[in-house]
Curated annotation (Swiss-Prot):
Keyword Transmembrane: yes
Organism: Penicillium thymicola
Cross-referenced SUPFAM superfamilies: FAD/NAD(P)-binding domain
Metabolic or biological pathway: Secondary metabolite biosynthesis; Alkaloid biosynthesis; Mycotoxin biosynthesis
Catalyzed reactions per annotation: [(1'E)-3'-hydroxy-3',7'-dimethylocta-1',6'-dien-1'-yl]-quinolinone B + NADPH + O2 + H(+) = [(1'E)-5'-(3',3'-dimethyloxiran-2'-yl)-3'-hydroxy-3'-methylpent-1'-en-1'-yl]-quinolinone B + NADP(+) + H2O
Enzyme class: oxidoreductase
Keywords: FAD, Flavoprotein, Glycoprotein, Membrane, Monooxygenase, Oxidoreductase, Transmembrane, Transmembrane helix
High-level lineage: Eukaryota, Fungi, Dikarya, Ascomycota, Pezizomycotina
Main function: FAD-dependent monooxygenase; part of the gene cluster that mediates the biosynthesis of penigequinolones, potent insecticidal alkaloids that contain a highly modified 10-carbon prenyl group. The first stage is catalyzed by the nonribosomal peptide synthetase penN that condenses anthranilic acid and O-methyl-L-tyrosine to produce 4'-methoxycyclopeptin. 4'-methoxycyclopeptin is then converted to 4'-methoxydehydrocyclopeptin by the ketoglutarate-dependent dioxygenase penM through dehydrogenation to form a double bond between C-alpha and C-beta of the O-methyltyrosine side chain.
Disruption phenotype: Leads to the disappearance of penigequinolone, and the accumulation of the styrenyl quinolone precusor as well as the minor metabolites yaequinolone J1 and J2.
Protein name, as recorded: FAD-dependent monooxygenase penE
Positions of transmembrane segments: 446-466
EC number(s) recorded for this UniProt protein: 1.-.-.-
Domain of life: Eukaryota
């Protein structure tokens, strides 16, 4: 009897899950998407930034144009500090010129709608299917949903977000088969130190389309993105009084968001605009705890995790969704490679394990670097300690070339779908910044060497100079 086709079960109609579905459809690989909610694209008041590394994958899939035409590209950013100092930068425009893709922001709902609308096999996406159990088989695996339905396949992909049931099931299987693989440290590695209010507001005079603003304060920050027709996407984060370990997270309501914004209502954003203006013009708003964590175990058996289910970061550098898109592109490329190699007729547990080990090895270091940048970004923008206040205020505004070069190198390393052609609109920045005579370690080493004397000089200026100026000068 002919062996059934290789099948992927994607749990979660998230950006990661739907992107993977698009990739697999392009490769004619059988799959199904199971979403626990009743709708693929609910309005939750959240939004996402799409950077060139995510845009390039969407362009390979032929869907980036649908997203791009619904907003305006960013060309300028402004940064404001609590002492009133501010500066502006054309970094967003520079990134677009170098890579051929702009930085844009869209409602998360609209991104999901585009992914769903442009997906060619709607019957493969099934809503109201909450997965409650994973069962292992001799030559595959299956999931059982809350309503008793069973879906069998060769690979189960957890794209179900930070509260992933697939991660929990993967851990349960690992505990039964390989006790000790999932350590207590890993189970507690997802933590919460910040709360965040996401919002979308109607146009506010003085906030120009195509611009974004970072307003830093002690313990909090406000970041606004001004889209098409002046629509304002924004988020505010604030350091909590203590650190929480998942799943013992604080929970927040709309009333909490109202209280949060009322308490920060007078915090300035730009010129005479303050938080109160964002709240007054709000269209939608939500408040959530910001989990942070990078798990060490991305796969076990025939189960693998993507996106927020395995690496969760704050929104400060805007790479969460883009990182998930890269995950999907990489995994689809590896699956396609396995099937094209002729191994499709006998995808043993060993075949799948080898594929997933390669997947994690390809993605882990890049994701770790992005995660660390996200952690640092949140703490720099909220002026978390004296050193970050010092660097953020007196170093950051004056090292634009260093920052833009480092950012472009990070973007250029983005993973793509290797069985689809690269888009023609891609510009020279991809090749230019991916080539380097220095390794990452060397780059970071020189960055540290460069920054150390700057910080040392600032220390001397701030602390030693006042004392030395009061000392008698010897003849």
């Amino acid at each position: 009897m002919e062996k059934p086709e290789f099948k992927v079960i994607i749990v979660g109609g998230s950006i990661a899950g739907l992107t993977l579905a698009h990739c697999l459809a392009q490769a004619n690989i059988d799959h199904v998407v199971l979403e626990k909610r009743s709708a693929i694209a609910p309005q939750e008041g959240a939004f996402i930034g799409i950077w060139p590394n995510g845009a390039r994958v969407f362009e390979q899939l032929g869907i980036f144009g649908d997203m791009e035409k619904q907003t305006v590209p960013f060309h300028r950013m402004h940064l404001r500090y609590p002492d009133g100092f501010s500066f502006s930068s054309s970094l967003p425009e520079l990134v677009s010129e170098r890579f051929g893709y702009p930085i844009i922001t869209l409602d998360r709902q609209r991104v999901l709608e585009v992914l769903h609308e442009r997906y060619p096999f709607k019957s493969n996406i099934i809503v109201n299917k909450k997965v409650v159990e994973i069962q292992t088989l001799d030559h595959g695996a299956r999931v059982v949903t809350e309503d008793g339905a069973v879906y069998t396949g060769d690979l189960i992909v957890g794209a179900d977000g930070v509260h992933s049931s697939i991660r929990s099931e993967m851990w349960r299987l690992a505990d039964a088969i390989s006790p000790g693989l999932i350590t207590e440290h890993e189970r507690k590695s997802l933590t919460v130190e910040y709360a965040c209010v996401f919002g979308i507001s109607s146009p506010i005079p003085g906030l120009e389309s195509g611009e974004l603003i970072n307003s830093y304060s002690d313990g909090s920050c406000v970041i606004t993105f001004h889209g098409e027709d002046g629509r304002v996407f924004w988020f505010m984060i604030e350091k909590l009084q203590r650190k929480y370990v998942y799943p013992d997270n604080p929970r927040f309501s709309v009333d909490d968001a109202a209280g949060f914004c009322a308490r920060l209502s007078s915090v300035p954003i730009w010129r005479d605009i303050c938080v109160a203006h964002l709240w007054r013009n709000r269209i939608s708003v939500s408040m959530t705890a910001l989990e942070e964590g990078l798990f060490q175990t991305w796969h076990f058996g025939r189960v693998v995790l993507l996106g927020d289910s395995v690496h969760k970061m704050t929104p400060n550098i805007g790479q969460g969704a883009n990182t998930a898109v890269e995950d999907a592109a990489t995994l689809a490329s590896l699956i396609n490679g396995l099937l094209k190699s002729g191994s499709a007729s006998h995808t043993s547990d060993s075949d799948i394990n080898n594929l997933l080990r390669v997947f994690q090895s390809l993605r882990y270091d890049r994701v770790k670097r992005t995660y660390q940048q996200s952690c640092s970004g949140a703490r720099l923008q909220t002026r978390d300690d004296f050193l970050k206040i010092l660097v953020g205020r007196y170093v950051f505004p004056y090292v634009g070339d260093y920052i833009s070069h480092s950012m472009c190198k990070d973007i250029s390393g983005g993973h793509v779908i290797d069985f689809l052609p690269l888009p023609k609109r891609s510009k020279a920045g991809w090749a230019k910044y991916s080539r380097s005579n220095r390794s990452r370690a060397t780059q970071l080493q020189w960055g540290s060497i460069w920054l150390s004397p700057v910080i040392l000089c600032l220390f001397c200026m701030l602390f030693l100079w006042p004392w030395s100026s009061s000392l008698p000068i010897s003849s």
